[in-house]
Design a protein with these regions (language model features):
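Glycine/charge-rich catalytic "coupling/switch" loops of P-loop NTPases
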Residues: 258-307, 324, 332-357
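A short, proline-enriched helix->beta-strand linker immediately N-terminal to the Walker B motif
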Residues: 148-152
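ABC ATPase NBD coupling module
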Residues: 63-79, 103
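Conserved ABC ATPase "signature" region
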Residues: 62-67, 108-125, 176-177
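Internal alpha/beta loop-helix hairpins
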Residues: 180, 190-259
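Catalytic Walker B motif of ABC-type/P-loop ATPase nucleotide-binding domains
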Residues: 154-158
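Conserved ABC ATPase signature
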Residues: 129-133, 137
Length: 357
């Protein structure tokens, strides 16, 4: 069975962890929640860094822990990337990478050294001392080192949390490429909705040590009854395909049933599948399709649900013609002026779209 199965109960002082979820052992599953929700503790239990008082951790049918059996961390085939890169300070970048890689028998290495170096863009850093790396460079090296141990599971504990906004934006494309290139399932801890939207296939929502819900990320991101939809950076993920390129205005059109959106020109073949991220704050609503506006992205939609965020704002869940869902954040005044109600047909005006893959 190709699943990650977790069912653990553990006391950490006054904090009680009671977590149960099952997720496919492929792609990226994000563990999301506020600080103190138990995300890192779950990851540490899966890694064997803490031994849960009770429960089971099973990866692809292989039991790593149950009430009678416990596999120590060093015998679990996993890679772990911490919030701050834990590199050996006395070794160069190359030596850090080779440390774990050389411990794997050559016939068991699933990832080529040069491939990992190229994918993470760290070729120019190989002979550099780790003390001379920026925060973003250190994390890329740490990720490459984890990959080169040929893990069956990659655990990433808020790997971007210590980076500034610019460094985060620089490293996200590497993480996106990583999960496209290698068939290694990942559990990714984050409290940033933008990271989750860009990287996750599935989502486990945690609150006060318990699982609120888990499932498909695109669906859960747009559930207005869940706290993630109320974050300032709340976003939706839409899937489509490259429908056309506009060389005059350097745009690429991403088509979906019933509409299309434009992104900055990308060198992608027409017909190729694509995913885009749309921030809820970048989606306004209109009763009519307008041509006398600077907004060129308009998608016909139906109002599914609304939820008050604060006394002045609402979050609106929309369903597009192809069944995909989209969030919009608008003022209560605007909603009242439009006569907004469940089932209403209208147009979503999308100011900005980010291509993910």
């Amino acid at each position: 069975m190709s699943d990650i199965e977790v069912s653990i109960a553990h006391a950490l002082g006054d904090f009680r962890l009671e977590v149960v979820f099952t997720t496919p052992a492929k792609g990226v599953t994000a563990l999301f929640g506020h600080s103190g929700s138990g995300k890192t503790s779950v990851l540490r239990a899966i890694a064997g860094l803490i031994r849960a008082d009770h429960g089971t951790v099973k990866i692809n049918g292989e039991v790593w822990q149950d009430d009678r059996h416990f596999v120590p961390t060093h015998k679990r085939p996993l890679g772990y990337v911490f919030q701050e890169a834990s590199l050996f300070p006395h070794l160069s970048v190359r030596q850090n990478l080779e440390y774990g890689w050389r411990q794997i028998p050559a016939d068991q290495r699933k990832i080529n050294f040069d491939t990992a170096v190229e994918l993470l863009g760290i070729g120019p850093l190989l002979e550099r001392a780790t003390s001379r790396l920026s925060g973003g460079e250190r994390q890329r090296v740490a990720i490459a080192r984890a990959l080169l141990t040929s893990p069956k599971l990659l655990l990433m504990d808020e790997p971007l949390s210590a980076l500034d906004h610019g460094a985060k934006q620089a490293i996200l494309p590497y993480l996106e490429s990583l999960h496209d290139e290698f068939d290694i399932p990942s559990l990714y801890v984050s409290h940033d909705p933008n990271e989750v939207a860009r990287l996750a296939d599935r989502l486990v929502l945690l609150e006060k040590g318990k699982v609120v819900t888990y499932g498909d990320a695109a669906n859960l991101l747009t559930r207005v009854d869940l706290p993630i939809a109320r974050y300032d950076d709340a976003a939706s993920i839409l899937e489509g395909y490259v429908s056309a390129h506009d060389p005059t205005f350097h745009l690429t059109w991403i088509g979906m049933h019933g509409g299309r959106v434009a992104v900055s020109r990308e060198d992608m073949a027409v017909g190729k599948r694509a995913r885009v991220e749309i921030q809820a704050r970048d989606v306004s609503l209109s009763l009519k399709a307008h041509s006398d506006t600077s907004i060129i992205n308009m998608l016909p939609a139906r109002v599914v649900d609304t939820q008050e965020i604060n006394p002045s704002q609402l979050i609106v869940r929309l369903e597009l013609d192809d069944g995909q869902t989209l969030l919009s954040r608008i003022t209560r005044r605007s909603a009242m002026g439009m006569g907004l109600h469940e089932g209403m047909r209208l147009y979503a005006q999308v100011k900005s779209v980010a291509l993910i893959a």
